[in-house]
Amino acid sequence: AMRFLEDVLAEVMDIFPSEYIHIGGDECPKTRWEQCPKCQAKIKELGLKDDAHFTAENYLQSYVMTRMEKFVEDHGRKVIGWDEVLEGGLGPKVTVMSWRSVDGGREGAKQHHDVIMTPCSHLYFDYYQTDNTDDEPIAIGGYIPVSRVYEFEPIPSELTEEEAKHILGAQANLWVEYIKDMNTAFYRVLPRMD
């Protein structure tokens, strides 16, 4: 599995010359890993254990992510991962994309990681922008009016000045599995992105 991941990342890096490579790390079904004999064997081999903070499966994901981080960095690139990469620990140079809430971004900044804020509560443009959805194009759900987007402050007020320097900015997302055409995409994005 690790060789496969490295091969995929090598090909991605060959195609895309960007400074950063996003390696994901979100929505990883750790409940499956609890039942997976190969995963449990690897957990045992690595001596990973549940503790007060995380499960052995969280630490297994951290092991995989840390290996991929090293692989990417060995190729002269920097790693970005979704905020789940904080669960179980991560390398010091990983940039965290905080999507589930601002909490992951806050925690990442407190741990001195660079952070891109992209919380689904404010910046997921595949959500409805009106609460009257009867005549709206189908959306994945949620409701984010323009006012909520515009009120979003990417730097949490409780961060120290030094921690706040790690907030690189914000990013809005438009996931397209429910977007039928470009007109719908533009409708979802504007005026929220304006």
Regions found by a protein language model. Give the residues of each.
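Flexible, acidic glycine-rich loops studded with aromatic residues
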Residues: 78-94, 98-194
